Amino acid sequence: MVCRNVSRQQFRAIMIITSLLDTDLYKFSMMQVVLHHFPAAQVEYRYKCRTPGINLRPYLDEIRAEVHELCQLRFTSEELDYLRGLRFIKSDFVDFLGLFHLPERCIFIGEGEQPGEISITVKGPWLHTILFEIPVLAIVNEVYFRNTRRNPDWEEGRKRLQSKMNLVLDDPALADFRVAEYGTRRRFSKVWHEEIVSTMKARMGVHFAGTSNVLLAMRHGVLPLGTMGHEYLQACQALGPRLRDSQVFALEVWAKEYRGDLGIALSDVYGMDAFLRDFDMYFCKLFDGARHDSGDPFVWGERLLEHYRANRADPRAKTLVFSDSLTFPRAIELARQFAGRCKVSFGIGTNLTNDLGHEPLQIVMKMVRCNGQPVAKVSDAPEKTMCDDPAYLAYLRQVFQLPPA
């Protein structure tokens, strides 16, 4: 499916989410852990738009209608067979997905407190609500842009994409450069998203590592990519034995589930200092690498390589994954910085799937509670910290020896 074949009427009329696979792989890898280890956990997610001045209220009914259709979807036999073929997916999980649908009773969509703001809350069993986040954000994005950008400049988007790819293709020194597409949640539209993936596959060859989107990976025969997200480590604040040990608990449960597979640890739920304190020699040797998602990526990478050396793990055998607001020029800088010192991989999201010449929305949907207890993400970028309980956030900072906000 490519954008040149889609009329304006089709662009507006196509149902946005038509498959439950139209989400990121890490949702399934986390969901499998939830099924096997935390099936009774109750959670709450909350939507937030970080872009000022955005008025989404005129589109509330449209968003509700799309979410209603999302909740009617079931996995098809073809989709279940595809998931069953992934080496780390277990048969009982696929059997569960065969019975699964998103429960409409668990999502609440209304007006927000500020002018133009909307409110989206998801509340219910973690196992049954974990798949809401990505498609709901994709729906909000596409509804907004199909109403405010009625004649998308596809050609401008194609020119921008080609210029990005040329930065890699025209430089022989970047023969080992690998980039993945990570842009489902903030994409301009699903048809544009698919064109991005098909174009990168066709033109970038071995430089294109794959996509986080499971549906597009299945359709285009590319590798689906992803391991764990912030919500997993956040939930473990409430599910583990005590708060101070929650990061270690999360990594140990992950290792117990995947036995060395899907071995990229997320480093920024409590900041890099706290991550390195917990990421001891055992984890350094057990996990394949770590993912950067906030703070200075160059400083982060240097600190992680030094940490590996201090723990007698060869950095050259480890993978550093960079995914924080990446652009191609920044990814190339990082590739040059760490060339020959470790393996590097890059996940680029919004800069690929929503770069047609206008400002993309900065929207998120984060877990705020688990089993009735507040949970928080305290990243290396202060603006990404999200928690609805200031007292809990202050306590968490004290427990993990983090500086005050």
Swiss-Prot record:
EC number(s) from the headed UniProt entry: 6.3.4.21
Domain of life: Bacteria
BP GO annotations: NAD biosynthetic process via the salvage pathway
Gene Ontology CC entries for this record: cytosol
InterPro entries: N/Namide_PRibTrfase, NAPRTase_N, Nic_PRibTrfase, Nic_PRibTrfase-Fam, Nicotinate_pribotase-like_C
Record keyword Ligase present: yes
PTM note: Transiently phosphorylated on a His residue during the reaction cycle. Phosphorylation strongly increases the affinity for substrates and increases the rate of nicotinate D-ribonucleotide production. Dephosphorylation regenerates the low-affinity form of the enzyme, leading to product release.
Keyword Phosphoprotein: yes
PANTHER family in the record: NICOTINATE PHOSPHORIBOSYLTRANSFERASE
Entry function: Catalyzes the synthesis of beta-nicotinate D-ribonucleotide from nicotinate and 5-phospho-D-ribose 1-phosphate at the expense of ATP.
HAMAP family according to UniProt: NAPRTase
Protein name from the UniProt record: Nicotinate phosphoribosyltransferase
Organism: Bordetella bronchiseptica (strain ATCC BAA-588 / NCTC 13252 / RB50) (Alcaligenes bronchisepticus)
